[in-house]
Every structure is written in C-alpha cells, then in structure tokens.
Amino acid sequence: MVELNDVPGEEEFPRATYLETMVRLLDTVSYNDENFTDEERVECLKYAYGKAAEHFAQPHVQETLKVPPKRMAAALKTIVGMCVYSWCRVSKEVMADLSIHYTYTLLLDDSREEPAGTMATWYEDLLNARPQAHGWWRLVNDFIPNVLRHYGGYCQMNMVRSTIDFFQGCWIEQHNFKGFRGSSDYPGFLRRINGLGHCVGSSIWPIELVDEEEHFLEITTAIAQMENWMVWTNDLFSFYKEYFAERDQTSLVNNYVECEGITLDQALDKLCKDTIRSSEEIIQVFHDKDPKMYEILTRFIQGYITWHLCDDRYRLVEVYEAAGDDPVAQKFKKYAESARRVGAIDPARYCVPSVTELCEREMAKQSAGRSWDFGLGKIANKISSVAQ
C-alpha cells in the first residue's frame, strides 16, 4: 500500500475563498429547500433507515464487510439522508433500495483494502455466474437487482456501468496518486469514474415517475449534466472535511494543484466556476422541457445541497461556527441556518432501532444457537454412552 500524504494544518486552510465559493453556488441555485414537511422527512428517513439497517445487520453481510459497528452506523445515517433528501419524489421503497446500494459504495470509498489480489478473475466469474473473489462484489451483485427493478433497461445499464467505474476509481485512490505534473486530463478522468455521476443521474428516473422511452432524450441529457454537477457539488461541500483527512488527499482540487501546477485558491476557483456553469446549464436546458422532469431535477439539487450542509460527515457546522462577520460569512450562515431548519433531524427520531442494535441482536441469536447446538451435542453424547 502506498504511503498516505501529510495532512495540512488548520492555519493553511483557505477559509475566505471557501466561504465565497459556497455562497456563489448557493446564490446560483437560489437555495431554499422546500422538498418536505418535517413529518414527511422523518417518515421517509425512518422507513429507508429501517430497511437498510435490517439489510446490513444480516450476519453474512457483517462477516463479509468486516466494518466496525460505529463506522457502519455513521455510513448508513449519511447515505439514508442523501437518498431521502435528494430523491424526494420517489417512493419510500426506492429510497430504501438506493440507500442500501449507495451505502455499499460509501463503505468501499472509505476502505483501505487493496483489491488487486481478488480481481484477476472478475470478468470470468461474472460471465460464468460464479461468486466473486472480492467480498464487496459478492454482496453488491447479490443486492443490485433489487435496485435495478425500479428502472428501465437504459438506466439500469448506466447504473451498473457506473458502479463498475466507481470500483476502479476507488482502486486508483488506494495508490494515493494525484497525477503527474502536466497531465491535465487526469483529475477529471479520476473524478468521472469514481464519482458515480452516471449511476446517480440515472437513478433519479425510476419508472414509477418517468417513462424511459418517452423521455429518453431528456434522461440522457440529465445524466450528462448530473455526471459533473453532482460530483463537483460534492467536491465543493466536502472540501473542508477532505482537507484534513489523510484518506482524502487525492481530491479533485488537490489533483488540479498537482497536475496543473496551480495554487489551492486557483483550484478552488476553477471548481467553483465549473459547478456554477453546470448549475446554470441544468436550469437553462430543462426550464422549458417537461415540467415534471424540471421539478425532479431542481428538487434533487435543493435536497442534495441540504444534505451536505447538515450531515455530520462534511463537518460544515465547523465552518459555520468559525465564520466571521463579513458579508460573505454572514450570507453563508443564513444559508446554513436555512438548511439546518429543515435538514438537521435528530437521529433518535428515525434511527430506531439502530443498525448497531440490530447487529448485536443477530450476534446474540447466533451465540444462543451455538450454545443450543453445543447442549444438544452433549446430551447426544451422554445418550450414546449409556447405550453402549
């Protein structure tokens, strides 16, 4: 495994530039999340979390993933929030299945496991319907039909292909490679394959909402636009937490710096301009298309931003608390407060029972089963001895 890079210090963080870039994006999309009432949001969170927690508490899933309960709980809470807040017009069943699929991707993204030793027969095993050598692929292949059933064939193919791309992107990240100087195509290449943009862009359109053939051209365009918008927005809002995370030093912004020889402020500005341009294009392209599709996209944008501003993973409350009193900082604070009014939901309202509790119950069942089997074995031995 390649050594991870040093993490920069707090004093080096470009706080003023970062606040300005976030505010510029929030202004561009006219951020104001009205996707749910409080009761609706909690109801959807509770349903999706419950279904996903049951899935990940299964003994064979736990044994294969070997993820500590605390990390599993954090990952599940994060992804359920993303799927509910962003996919606000789909059924609760779709939210739940997407929550499970994207939790698998988050767990892989946070993993440090080197996959090379288990991937030599990946395609051969897939072609011959043999179990994959890599445990993550065994679980994902087993579950993904539950997700795909909600979509038409075109979106299904995009989602599967994008998931494969994502795995390869995580594989590259295991090498902590920011790219060679002068390779200006590398940062975008890596971000496209590890961003799940096509999977997300396709999964916005389940057949319960949209006829795939009727809206084929709009769906294709939306996938093309969301490929960049979704990952660039994520890069912008996750920049703070990734800046201080040892595992996340191969971020898009850092890769721009390494490959193009520009400063961190210049790289942030580049990301901001690209994200704003993408946001403007989505609005301009779809505002005169089918009203339902425009509404789905704009509500996705609002919810996706709310999720980032509220989820503990992104630590943006720290940025909020450290923001000063200048006009840009004050504007960011107002946006953050607006997001938290609708999106900062106490986990006790929906993480019940928690995935940790469900895992403990399953372990207790297994332990009781082993004790029962052992007791029966002792009785059988005694009977056998008496019979002799």
UniProtKB/Swiss-Prot annotation:
Trichothecenes are sesquiterpenoid toxins that act by inhibiting protein biosynthesis. It comes from the Eukaryota. It is an enzyme of class 4 (lyase). This is Trichodiene synthase. Pfam families: TRI5. Keywords: Lyase, Magnesium, Metal-binding. Its EC number is 4.2.3.6. Residues 109-113 are annotated as: Aspartate-rich domain. Disruption phenotype: Impairs the production of harzianum A and leads to the production of a larger quantity of the aspinolides B and C. Mg(2+) 1 binds at residues 109, 173. Induction: Expression is positively regulated by the cluster-specific transcription factor TRI6. One of its GO terms (biological process) is sesquiterpenoid biosynthetic process. Its cofactor is Mg(2+); Mn(2+). Trichodiene synthase; part of the gene cluster that mediates the production of the antimicrobial trichothecene harzianum A (HA) that plays a role in Botrytis cinerea antagonistic activity and plant defense priming. The biosynthesis of harzianum A begins with the cyclization of farnesyl diphosphate to trichodiene and is catalyzed by the trichodiene synthase TRI5. Trichodiene undergoes a series of oxygenations catalyzed by the cytochrome P450 monooxygenase TRI4. Mg(2+) 3 binds at residue 248. Mg(2+) 2 binds at residues 234, 238, 242. It catalyses: (2E,6E)-farnesyl diphosphate = trichodiene + diphosphate. Some of the cofactor binding sites show unusual localization within the protein. GO terms for molecular function: metal ion binding; trichodiene synthase activity. Pathway: Sesquiterpene biosynthesis; trichothecene biosynthesis. Belongs to the trichodiene synthase family. Gene3D superfamilies: Farnesyl Diphosphate Synthase (1.10.600.10).
